[in-house]
Each structure stands twice: as structure tokens, then as C-alpha cells.
Amino acid sequence: MDYVSLLNQFWQKQIKSYKETPSQYHYLYPPRFFYKPVLGNLQHPTKWCCTIKFYEYSAQATECTKASAKQDAARLICEQLQAAGLLNGMELRFRSSASDIFGQNRYDASKSYFFSKTA
């Protein structure tokens, strides 16, 4: 699962909890992504700036491709949500070359993209 998928999973979990509340005014918009081309360098003359707005937070990242800019900005949003304590009960796992197809991923403490699953 990547950071964009984690944001979507968090959004769906929040929507489910909002539907269970009696108020009709609760609605959480899905993560919104905005792209604009920016001046790059010689190797990548055009880079992409991705801005994400989600749940009172916003983040901006600039990378060579739209996909990598989107993932980097989603990572920043996930860090903000984690710092606020909103990602409790959510986990993020990546498949690495060290894991087999049917096994779990090995935890690498040097990576910052693993969130611990909490109750």
C-alpha cells in the first residue's frame, strides 16, 4: 500500500464513522490533488508540483513525475495526520524484494514510511 492508498483508506474510514453520526452536516471531502508544471534542471527541464488538500491539512511536493510528486505530497500529509494522532489503527506496508509473495514484509527501522498499527 502506498501513501495515496493510505489517505483513501483513512477517508473511507472517516466517511463510515460520519454516516453513523446523526448530524446531516458532516462530510469529509476526498483528498484533492492539484498539479502545476514548474521549472526544473538540466536533467529534468520540467518538474511537477503537486498540492494536496485533505482534512484541514495541505502539503506540497515537487518531483520529476506527477506520480512521484503525488506520493511525496501524500507522505507529508500522512506525517501530519500521524503527528495529530489521526492515523491510529491504520498501517502502511510496502512489498520489498526481501519478502516473498505470500509472506509479510520485513520491518526496516531505517525507513520512515512504516506506521505502527495501534488499537
Curated annotation (Swiss-Prot):
Gene Ontology terms: cellular component: host cell mitochondrion; host cell nucleolus
One Gene Ontology term of the molecular function aspect: RNA binding
Q: Which GO terms describe its biological process?
A: symbiont-mediated perturbation of host apoptosis; symbiont-mediated perturbation of host cell cycle G0/G1 transition checkpoint; symbiont-mediated perturbation of host cell cycle progression
Coiled-coil stretches noted in the UniProt entry, renumbered to this chain:
none
Q: Which residues form the signal peptide?
A: none
Q: Extract the Pfam families matched here.
A: dsrm
Q: What keywords would UniProt list here?
A: Apoptosis, G0/G1 host cell cycle checkpoint dysregulation by virus, Host mitochondrion, Host nucleus, Host-virus interaction, Modulation of host cell apoptosis by virus, Modulation of host cell cycle by virus, RNA-binding
Xref: InterPro entries: dsRBD_dom
Domain called DRBM: residue spans: 2-83
Q: Where in the cell is it found?
A: Host nucleus, Host nucleolus; Host mitochondrion
What is known about what this protein does? Induces host cell G0/G1 arrest and apoptosis.
Q: How does it assemble?
A: Interacts with host RUNX1 isoform b.
Q: What is this protein called?
A: Non-structural protein 3b
Q: Give the taxonomic lineage as stored in the record.
A: Viruses, Riboviria, Orthornavirae, Pisuviricota, Pisoniviricetes
